[in-house]
Amino acid sequence: MLGVCYYPEHWPKARWKEDARRMREAGLSYVRVGEFAWALLEPEPGRLEWGWLDEALATLAAEGLKVVLGTPTATPPKWLVDRYPEVLPVDREGRRRRFGGRRHYCFSSPAYREEARRIVTLLAERYGGLEAVAGFQTDNEYGCHGTVRCYCPRCQEAFRGWLKARYGTIEALNEAWGTAFWSQRYRNFTEVELPHLTVAEPNPSHLLDYYRFASDQVRAFNRLQVEILRAHAPGKFITHNFMGFFTDLDAFALAQDLDFASWDSYPLGFTDLMPLPPEEKLRYARTGHPDVAAFHHDLYRGVGRGRFWVMEQQPGPVNWAPHNPSPTPGMVRLWTWEALAHGAEVVSYFRWRQAPFAQEQMHAGLHRPDSAPDQGFFEAKQVAEELAALALPPVAQAPVALVFDYEAAWVYEVQPQGAEWSYLGLIYLFYSALRRLGLDVDVVPPGASLRGYALTVVPSLPIVRGEALKAFQEAEGIVLFGPRSGSKTETFQIPRELPPGPLQALLPLKVVRVESLPPGLLEVAEGPMGRFSLGLWREWVESPLRPWLAFADGGGALYREGRYLYLAAWPSPELLGVLLAGLAQEAGLRPVFLPEGLRLRRRGPWVFAFNYGPEAVEAPAPEGARFLLGGKRVGPYDLAVWEEA
């Protein structure tokens, strides 16, 4: 199903009825409203003006449209900030942020939590039983603009309480953090400050705990809203719209309190921000990289325990990236179908009409500011017509699992040990290699069951807890670990037994030394799979195992024990392609090296082929396949769907 984000408060009431009618005629089913409307709902403290929202919801309902109602806590009004100036967050440099943008609040602020509780309760009491309201979105894009981590006095106080609950005694904290180093011992929890503005780098254990705390504070704030909505809006779904390439917040943890996950898909903006080779960035500037949206669909399907929406789908040029090209004609349709192929229940476009004013006036919508339909509108309407003729089959478990860990991203942010080391970069390298082989992927958190997966890839998991080790031991397929896995304890120390720590229960090896290398400094590793030039990261390993790949000095780059493999270097795309293809074949899968720009995704017995390239390509469909959309020759920026026997 399809939807759209709509802001009735931005437009004269005389337009609302016509807008709703055109939404229905375009084949849209859901409309998100209200997530930035607090100042219009409550223009002065205690003076509520519900009338305009009542009328807007009634207008949408009259056309049979279902509403996703956003709680308005992402934008506290000016009067609230003036009354409680302490709700404003403090940045890493110790500066109090100001009113005038959005997300201008601290998650730890008692005053703001109380105000949020009040407005969400009023909203839920008024609309929780309304038939037109299908569900709620909590807040909007938690953490956007660098707002997960605040450094205000309230956060410092809350952090001390969090530490006391975690460690119990200050002696335990000192031991866990290794505060004997640099004379950093603490006598009590009130001496512990937030880890910023230090002369040299702060203690990494301290910093990691602060990142954990900050993520927990967001979850607590979200749970406060969820509990209110559950009480006053029984039977209505609750979701939140997460962001792309964002790791400050543990979405797996927060989503435990939601019915499903949502995310905001902007393929062109993300591609422009990605550290891709220049030629690749130019090639996909108007289409988005072929794996950027797909990765997040698979991630948030995992976050949502099998269920997700795209709450905001890019319909045209955006306004927030360094460069904001217009999508190639056909791409809005392709992105929409791709989301559906990966299991999205709803794809909702942002926004119905481009705003002619304020910060996002250069962000395209389905309509231009003069209300004329724009390119994205016609493509969305085409998808709606195509969807009406098809009944999508359910999504099955993929044959490949990729283990993704937000805590791993924090570990490497705290201590990258190399300027180019990027957790997301490594994750994307593995994911893209799998996709280039035509393989479907489930993205799962550490500790999730790996039963039923023919192949599991763990690009890097520095902290291996007991539940994760148990899942690896019980995995039914091949498991590939990437560099730095098992390299830290839960308290951010090197394991006594050396890395890969607990994974030594699976692989008899020890990492005794590591190095990070500047770009261009490469070493050749070779073995039965071929010769590969590797750089950026290398580990020296002691092991009775004979390496599958070895460097010229005899050091190993890849080791195997039974169905477990350990990669002791940053892999090149060439190495990953050969290695993963071989492992997939061994696991009984059928990898296929796809043409550049072509990607596949299966949904039940249906196979989707998406062509991100400027030239037509042949879909790897068997002879006599029944095509539901398109044909065996997939045109530029087009797709095809066929049914497997």
Curated annotation (Swiss-Prot):
Q: State the reactions this protein catalyses.
A: Hydrolysis of terminal non-reducing beta-D-galactose residues in beta-D-galactosides
Signal peptide position in this chain?
none
State the similarity comment: Belongs to the glycosyl hydrolase 42 family.
Q: Which residues are substrate-binding?
A: R102, N140, W320, E360, Q361, M362, H363
InterPro entries attached to this UniProt entry: Beta_galactosidase_C, Beta_galactosidase_Trimer, Class_I_gatase-like, Glyco_hydro_42, Glyco_hydro_42_N, Glyco_hydro_b, Glycoside_hydrolase_SF
MF (Gene Ontology): beta-galactosidase activity; metal ion binding
Q: Which GO terms describe its biological process?
A: galactose metabolic process
A Gene Ontology cellular-component term: beta-galactosidase complex
Which keywords belong to this entry? Glycosidase, Hydrolase, Metal-binding, Zinc
EC number of the protein:
3.2.1.23
Q: In terms of temperature, how does the activity behave?
A: Optimum temperature is 90 degrees Celsius. Retains 90% of activity even at 95 degrees Celsius. Retains 80% of activity during a 12-hour period of incubation at 70 degrees Celsius. Half-lives at 80 and 90 degrees Celsius are 23 and 4.7 hours, respectively.
Provide the function of this protein: Hydrolyzes chromogen 5-bromo-4-chloro-3-indolyl-beta-D-galactopyranoside (X-Gal) and p-nitrophenyl-beta-D-galactoside (pNPGal).
Q: Where does Zn(2+) bind?
A: C106, C150, C152, C155
Q: How pH affects activity?
A: Optimum pH is around 5.0-6.0. Retains more than 80% of activity at pH range between 4.5 and 6.5. Retains 10% of activity at pH 4.0.
Q: What class of enzyme is it?
A: hydrolase
Q: What are the catalytic residues?
A: E141 (proton donor), E312 (nucleophile)
SUPFAM superfamilies referenced in this protein's UniProt entry, alphabetically: (Trans)glycosidases, Class I glutamine amidotransferase-like, Glycosyl hydrolase domain
The protein, known as: Beta-galactosidase BgaA
